[in-house]
Amino acid sequence: MAAVRGLRVSVKAGGGAEPEPMEVEEGEVEAAAGRTSPVEATADQTSPREVVPGSDRRYENRAGTFITGIDVTSKEAIEKKEQRAKRFHFRAEVSDDQRNVVLDREMMRKVPKVRLETLYICGVDEMSTQDIFAFFKQYPPGYIEWLDDSSCNVVWLDEVTASRALLNLSSKPTNEKGQRKKDGEHRSARSKKDRLDDSPQSSGDETEEGEVEEDNPNDAEVETENKSENPPETLSQAEQASILKNDLRPSIKTVKGNRLYMRFATKDDKKEHGAASKSQYYMKYGNPNYGGMKGILSNSWKKRYHSRRIQRDVIKKRTFIGDDVGLTPTYKHHHSGLVNVPEEPIEEEEEEEEEEEEDMDEDDRVVEYRDELQAFKREREGARRCAASNSDSDEMDYDLELKMISTPSPKKSMKMTMYADEVESQLKTIRHSMRSDSAGNSVKSRIGSKSHSEKPADVRLILEEKRQSTASRQQSSSSGKSDVRQRLGKRAHSPEIRKTLSIAPTSRREPLSDVHSRLGLPKQPEGKGLYSDSKEKKTGSLWNRLGTAPKEKDRASEKSGEKSQAAPEEEDSALQQAWGALIKEKEQIRQKKSRLDNLPSLQIEISRESSSGSDTDS
């Protein structure tokens, strides 16, 4: 070997102690093509194998990483290297990639919030993850953290390799780029000249690499003495000041016509929230997280894609996790394997009616999910503790997600409910209880409720209450008739008619021997004539039996009396016949009334007929 190049160590991707995963944006999936599959990190320390949180994605270098192992930029390492070259008679090749530069590590730690294992690279537009890994192929990094389309963080597994890459792949941030380029060309020409001078000797002797030339030992000793006299290069004060300021250093080489600028990354170099949705690279070349779709992707489309991906993966794998996570084998899932799966066409517009019908059907099978969610949280914590040594935590998260989706309860399906739905259900129950209470109170107020103290303690009291109720009903029924008569008021001529009718039956009991006795006239003594005195006849027992007549009848009787005084005896007999006919008519009316008095519903009609009959008689 012409020079001692440090120690190369090959580290497998994903091997060793990997940091725990970070939370990524909703709907994002790792991709194998383009920008390589990400690995998450959650460490907040400056140790070589841990990454500061703030970036959501880590794109791992699957080709293998490079670890220096020792600090070759320290003064002690450079002196050891020179002594080894002197011992084995090696001549060191001078190149830009392997400069003996002493870098004070303690001085670099003075930079605020510095991450010595990470370099911030900007100007990576139109570059993919593989292009950046190819740029740092001499110092292969561990992974890349994309910040936006034009900048990213390149992370190594140790601080020494990152500082070597910064010093050897970038130049001083000054205007003397041309001078730096000329110096680089001069060094490369001198190294070529030295190789040409050494080629005849090596071809003639056919010595193997690593063997010592014994023909010219004096020449080798002179060369090593000259080399040892040359001290190792040190950074100039201006370059040290620029590194302390953490200024951007331009790269020596260009990639796809782009000049890269780099510096040590800080904890403030984080990915902004929603940077993936603003990425012009994804819009132009396609988003590998969503099947290589180009253009602007809506949030609803991303959610549907994510749900379709989970369903397709469940159907494809056909492995469902049981109730006990520890007994069943863990589900090994790699997101990169889903990229090559043929995508199903996703409809942008779905019928809302079908969704509403499905929701209505599922509402009948809703189960309260609060207790089961707490049980799942306990299982998740226990699974993370048990499977920390066997599987990655991102796989466990995905396993639990698959378990929640693919293993419903045997009787009823579980459904997640929002907090607003729970509040609404509580309000409904409160309203229902209030309505039932108010309805019960209203019914009781209408019907009336007896207290326990009012209930009789003996059967005799109950019988007495029944008797009182029946007596009150009878009184009310009897008072009903009188109430009707009171409302109708006193009928005209009714009292007199009743009096005459009550007196008239007494006349029947008398022995009737002749017409006069049948008409109600008293018998005359033998000494007097039949029509001796009209006044005595009118004032006799007939008027006493008939009672007092009304005023109109009195007037009529007075007129008839006057006529009787002036008229002959024939007129008196005609008057008696008229009075007899009137008495018969009234007797018939009384009989009819006595028959109809037993019908209470016809009392009004009877009163009307009697009143009309009295009017006609008058």
Swiss-Prot record:
GO terms for biological process: 7-methylguanosine mRNA capping; mRNA transport. GO terms for cellular component: cytoplasm; nucleus. Residues 117-178 are annotated as: RNA recognition motif (RRM) domain. Residues 20-29, 205-223, 344-365 have a biased composition (Acidic residues). It is found in: Nucleus; Cytoplasm. Keywords: Cytoplasm, mRNA capping, mRNA processing, mRNA transport, Nucleus, RNA-binding, Transport. InterPro entries: NCBP3. It comes from the Eukaryota. Residues 469-481, 609-618 have a biased composition (Low complexity). One of its GO terms (molecular function) is RNA cap binding. Residues 231-240, 436-450 have a biased composition (Polar residues). Component of an alternative cap-binding complex (CBC) composed of NCBP1/CBP80 and NCBP3. Belongs to the NCBP3 family. Associates with NCBP1/CBP80 to form an alternative cap-binding complex (CBC) which plays a key role in mRNA export. NCBP3 serves as adapter protein linking the capped RNAs (m7GpppG-capped RNA) to NCBP1/CBP80. Unlike the conventional CBC with NCBP2 which binds both small nuclear RNA (snRNA) and messenger (mRNA) and is involved in their export from the nucleus, the alternative CBC with NCBP3 does not bind snRNA and associates only with mRNA thereby playing a role in only mRNA export. PANTHER family: NUCLEAR CAP-BINDING PROTEIN SUBUNIT 3. This is Nuclear cap-binding protein subunit 3.
